[in-house]
């Protein structure tokens, strides 16, 4: 895992088209902004895990 230090207002690049900007820090929470092309999915980990679980175990009638 690459670990980086950024201050509020600073940005990091992921590849050529994705940017992650630190918008604010309050206590133990960090607000970040992600700019990515529309074809790149961006999710919080807990949402991504729920999506993956739903793909593995679709509810009856939702297939």
Swiss-Prot record:
Pfam entry (one): CsrA
Domain of life, source organism: Bacteria
GO biological process: mRNA catabolic process; negative regulation of translational initiation; positive regulation of translational initiation; regulation of carbohydrate metabolic process
Alphabetical keyword list: Activator, Cytoplasm, Repressor, RNA-binding, Translation regulation
InterPro entries: CsrA, CsrA_sf
Annotated compartments: Cytoplasm
GO molecular function: mRNA 5'-UTR binding
Transmembrane regions listed in the UniProt entry: none
Function of the protein: A key translational regulator that binds mRNA to regulate translation initiation and/or mRNA stability. Mediates global changes in gene expression, shifting from rapid growth to stress survival by linking envelope stress, the stringent response and the catabolite repression systems. Usually binds in the 5'-UTR; binding at or near the Shine-Dalgarno sequence prevents ribosome-binding, repressing translation, binding elsewhere in the 5'-UTR can activate translation and/or stabilize the mRNA. Its function is antagonized by small RNA(s).
Cross-referenced PANTHER family: CARBON STORAGE REGULATOR
UniProt-listed NCBIfam families: csrA, PRK01712.1
Name of the molecule in the record: Translational regulator CsrA
């Amino acid at each position: 895992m690459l670990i980086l230090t950024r201050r509020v207002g600073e940005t990091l690049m992921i590849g050529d088209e994705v940017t992650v900007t630190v918008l604010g820090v309050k206590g133990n929470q960090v607000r970040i902004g992600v700019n990515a092309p529309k074809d790149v999915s961006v999710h919080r980990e807990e949402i991504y895990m729920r999506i993956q679980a739903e793909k593995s175990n679709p509810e009856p009638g939702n297939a």
